Amino acid sequence: MARNSRIRITNNDKALYAKLVKNTKAKISRTKKKYGIDLSNEIELPPLESFQTRKEFNEWKRKQESFTNRANQNYQFVKNKYGIVASKAKINEIEKNTKEAQRIVDEQREEIEDKPFISGGKQQGTVGQRMQILSPSQVTGVSRPSDFNFDDVRSYARLRTLEEGMAEKASPDYYDRRMAQMHQNFIEIVEKSFNSYWLTDELVERLKKIPPDDFFELYLIFDEISFEYFDSEGEDVEASEAMLNKIHSYLDRYERGDVNLDLKGF
C-alpha cells in the first residue's frame, strides 16, 4: 500500500488556510451573536503546520467549506417569535416526519372506513360513518398529528417532544406497537373488571390467541369490544353476561373466518 507523503506547504495552501479560518471564525461569531448558538466545538482549527499529509489537509478543507456553506442546513438557523432557535435541518426533519405520520394515519383511515360497524349483533352503518359522528381518533385510538409550525413552538422542551414524537410516529413500527399495547390493555381490563369469572376467564384466553392487528380490526368493527364497557376499578361496569356472550359470538365468527380482516401488513 502506498504511503501518503508528508505535505509540502505552498503559498497557495497558506492563503487558502487563512481564508477558510477567517470564514469559519466569522460564521461562529455571527451565529453566536445572532442566535446565541456556540459552534466553536463543531469544527477544529488546527495550525497549518500540524497537517502531516495532503490528504489530511484536503479533508480538513472539505469540512470547513461544508461548515460555511449556506446550503448546509445543519448550520443554518431560524429564531421564532418566542426566541426558540433551531437549525433548518431539524425543522425540515420534523416537518418531513409530521407529513409521513399524517400520511400513515390517513392511509389507515381510508383502509377502514368501509368496514361494517356492528352493535348488538347487527350492522349499524360503517366505521367511516362512525368516525363522522364521533371523531376518527375516538374510533381508532390513533390521533392524526397537526401540521408542524415552528412559529408556534414556545419552549425547547416542546420542540424536543415534537422532534422525538414525530420521528417515532413516522415509523410504521409505532402503529404495530400501539396495536399490541391496545390488545394487551383490553385483555387486562377484561380481567380486572370481573376479577375471576369463568366466562371472563375463557374470553381472556381466547383474546390472547388473537394477533394484535386482528384484534384492532375486531375492535373497530364490533361495538361490544370496547374499553368503555369494562372498568378496571370494578365500578360502573356495564359489561354483563349477555355482553360477554355476545363478544364470544363475535370471536366464534372470527375463528370461523367469517369476518373480513384485510389490514394485514398495514
UniProtKB/Swiss-Prot annotation:
Q: Which domain of life is it from?
A: Viruses
* One GO cellular component term: virion component
Which of the residues bear the PTM O-(5'-phospho-DNA)-serine?
Answer: 232
- Renumbered to this chain, region (Intermediate) spans 74-172
Q: Where is this site: Positions the 3' end of the template strand at the active site of the DNA polymerase?
A: 230
| UniProt keyword annotations, A-Z | Covalent protein-DNA linkage, Degradation of host cell envelope components during virus entry, Degradation of host peptidoglycans during virus entry, DNA replication, Early protein, Hydrolase, Phosphoprotein, Viral DNA replication, Virion, Virus entry into host cell
Chain intervals for the UniProt region annotation (Interaction with the viral DNA polymerase) = 256-258
Q: Name one GO molecular function term.
A: hydrolase activity
Q: What processes in GO biological process is this protein linked to?
A: DNA replication, synthesis of primer; symbiont entry into host cell via disruption of host cell envelope; symbiont entry into host cell via disruption of host cell wall peptidoglycan; viral DNA genome replication
- Positions of region (Disordered): 1-73
Entries under Pfam families matching the protein? Phi-29_GP3
Q: Where is this region: Priming?
A: 173-266
List locations, semicolon-separated. Virion
* Assembly: Interacts with the viral polymerase; this interaction allows the initiation of TP-primed DNA replication at both viral DNA ends. Binds to ssDNA. Interacts with the replication protein p1. Part of a DNA-gp3-gp16 complex.
What task does this protein carry out? Acts as a primer for DNA elongation during viral genomic replication. Acts as the small terminase protein during packaging. Recruits the phage DNA polymerase to the bacterial nucleoid. Primer terminal protein (TP) is covalently linked to the 5'-ends of both strands of the genome through a phosphodiester bond between the beta-hydroxyl group of a serine residue and the 5'-phosphate of the terminal deoxyadenylate (dAMP).
Instruction: Give the protein family.
Output: Belongs to the phi29likevirus DNA terminal protein family.
Q: Please state what the protein is called.
A: DNA terminal protein
Protein source organism: Bacillus phage B103 (Bacteriophage B103)
